[in-house]
C-alpha cells in the first residue's frame, strides 16, 4: 500500500525527473519535460489565484487527450480544485448540461469543441481556455483573465525572481503560490 499522499507522489516525480520527458502528444516530436510541465502548472496556479479560485471549485475539461489536457488536469488537482472530465464525444447540449450541473467555473476545451458550444448557455463559467495553447477563448463580463494572461510571464518573474526551479514545486493545496 502506498503510504504517501497522491499529490506528494507527483511533487516528488517532478523534482526527481526535472529534465526528463513527461508528456508527448501522439504523433508529434515535441515533448514537455517534467520541469516544463511544472512551470505550466505554476502559471495556471497563478491564474487560479488571480481569479480567487478556492479549494473545491470545479474546473471542466473536454477535448482529445493531449499534453495540455494533462497539464490542465494536474494544475487543477494540485491546486485543490475538482476536475470535471467530460467525454469529447458528447453532443453540445449534453456538454452544456454537464458543465452547468457540475457548477464548473472554468472550462478547458479544444478549439473545435468550443466552436459548437454556446457561451450564453454556460451560465456558471467565468472563463474558457483553449487546450491548444491555454489562451482565453471567453471570459464573463467583469473578469480580467485575458489581461492577466497577457502579463503571465511578468507575474512568473515577480513570483519566482530566480526563475521557476525544482525547489519551487510544492503541491500542498493552494501553496504553490508565494
Residue ranges and their predicted role:
Residues 22-66, 70, 74, 91-96, ...:
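Conserved AMP-binding/adenylate-forming core of the ANL superfamily
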Residues 88-120, 165:
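Conserved ATP-dependent adenylate/AMP-binding module captured primarily in the ANL superfamily
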Residues 9-33, 138:
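AMP-dependent adenylate-forming
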Residues 86-88, 132:
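Short beta->alpha connector loops at strand-helix junctions that form conserved
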Amino acid at each position: 500500500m502506498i503510504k504517501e499522499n497522491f499529490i506528494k507522489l507527483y511533487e516528488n516525480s517532478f523534482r526527481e525527473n526535472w529534465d526528463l520527458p513527461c508528456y508527448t502528444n501522439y504523433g508529434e516530436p515535441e515533448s514537455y519535460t517534467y520541469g516544463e510541465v511544472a512551470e505550466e502548472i505554476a502559471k495556471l496556479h497563478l491564474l487560479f489565484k488571480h481569479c480567487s479560485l478556492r479549494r473545491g471549485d470545479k474546473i471542466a475539461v473536454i477535448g482529445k487527450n493531449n499534453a495540455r489536457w494533462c497539464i490542465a488536469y494536474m494544475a487543477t488537482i494540485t491546486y485543490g480544485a475538482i476536475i470535471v472530465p467530460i467525454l469529447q464525444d458528447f453532443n453540445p447540449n449534453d456538454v452544456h448540461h454537464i458543465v452547468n450541473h457540475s457548477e464548473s467555473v472554468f472550462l478547458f476545451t479544444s478549439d473545435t469543441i468550443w466552436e459548437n458550444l454556446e457561451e450564453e448557455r454556460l451560465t456558471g463559467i467565468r472563463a474558457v481556455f483553449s487546450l491548444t495553447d491555454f489562451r482565453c477563448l471567453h471570459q464573463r463580463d467583469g473578469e480580467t483573465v485575458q489581461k492577466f494572461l497577457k502579463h503571465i510571464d511578468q507575474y512568473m518573474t515577480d513570483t519566482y525572481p530566480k526563475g521557476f526551479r525544482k525547489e519551487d514545486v510544492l503541491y500542498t493545496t493552494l501553496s504553490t503560490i508565494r
